[in-house]
A protein has these predicted regions:
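A surface/secretory-pathway sequence property marking extracellular, secreted
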Residues: 41, 92-135
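Beta-strand-rich interaction surfaces with strong enrichment in secreted/lumenal proteins
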Residues: 55-58, 134-146
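C-terminal, structured domain-capping segment
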Residues: 64-83, 141-212
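Gram-positive cell-envelope targeting signals
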Residues: 1-49, 70
Length: 212
C-alpha cells in the first residue's frame, strides 16, 4: 500500500447475543396425545457505517472531521433487544503492526488513543451512557414493533485533534467498533444495572455469542 501522510481506517465488527434453538413438548392424556411445538426466537443485530467509505479515508490532516456513524440495527426477524457498543483505538503501520507514537521523546500513544476516544464521544447521539465497564449502553430497547426504534447511531463523526503534527505522519489509526445485544424481555431482575439517573451502565452475568 502506498504510504500517505496520515491514513484513517476503520474496522467494524458486530457481535450479538443469541437465542436460537427449537424444542418440542408432548403432553399425554388417558385417551389421546397432544403435541405442542414451541420455537424460540433470536436476538440478531447488524452494524454498519453508512457515511464511511468502504475503501477508508486517506490524506487526513489535523483538525479534519471524518464522517463516521456506526449504526446498530435490529434484524427484522429479531426479538426486542438492548444493545451496547465498545470503541477501541489503535495506531498501526502500513502492514497492520501496532505502533508507538512518540513526541519530543515521550510516549504519547495512550494519550492520543484517549484523544480519539474523546473525539468519538463528542458527537455521540442521545440515549447512550458510558458504563462502568467501558461499554456504551443504549437505554432504549430496539424493537420492530410499530412506532418503535429499531436502530441506534453511536456517534456521527470524528475530528482529528488540531494539535497533532509530524509525529503521526505515515501512521494509520483504526477505530474498532463492536456491538452486542441482549434480549429485552423476561430478563432476570439482576441482569441490568442502572445508575442514579436510571441509565443502564452494565449487563451482569452475561456471556455474549454470535448468532449465525
Amino acid at each position: 500500500m502506498k504510504k500517505k501522510k496520515v491514513i484513517t481506517m476503520v474496522a467494524a465488527v458486530a457481535l450479538v447475543a443469541i437465542v436460537g434453538v427449537a424444542s418440542t413438548f408432548a403432553y399425554f392424556t388417558d385417551s389421546e396425545s397432544v403435541q405442542n411445538v414451541i420455537t424460540f426466537g433470536n436476538v440478531n443485530i447488524s452494524l454498519d457505517e453508512p457515511s464511511f467509505p468502504e475503501e477508508g479515508v486517506t490524506d487526513v490532516v489535523p483538525n479534519q472531521t471524518i464522517a463516521k456513524n456506526p449504526t446498530i440495527t435490529l434484524d427484522k426477524d429479531s426479538n426486542d433487544a438492548y444493545v451496547r457498543a465498545a470503541v477501541e483505538v489503535s495506531f498501526v503501520d502500513a502492514d497492520g503492526n501496532a505502533l508507538t507514537i512518540t513526541k519530543d521523546g515521550k510516549d504519547v500513544t495512550e494519550e492520543y488513543k484517549a484523544a480519539l476516544q474523546a473525539a468519538c464521544e463528542a458527537t455521540m447521539t442521545s440515549g447512550w451512557t458510558k458504563g462502568t465497564d467501558g461499554y456504551y449502553y443504549y437505554n432504549t430497547e430496539l424493537s420492530n414493533a410499530d412506532s418503535a426504534v429499531n436502530s441506534a447511531v453511536l456517534f456521527e463523526s470524528v475530528t482529528v485533534p488540531a494539535a497533532w503534527g509530524n509525529e503521526i505522519a505515515n501512521v494509520k489509526f483504526v477505530i474498532d467498533v463492536t456491538a452486542e445485544a441482549i434480549q429485552a424481555d423476561n430478563l432476570a431482575d439482576d441482569v441490568l444495572t442502572y445508575d442514579e439517573n436510571n441509565n443502564i451502565v452494565s449487563w451482569d452475568q452475561v456471556t455474549v455469542e454470535s448468532f449465525e
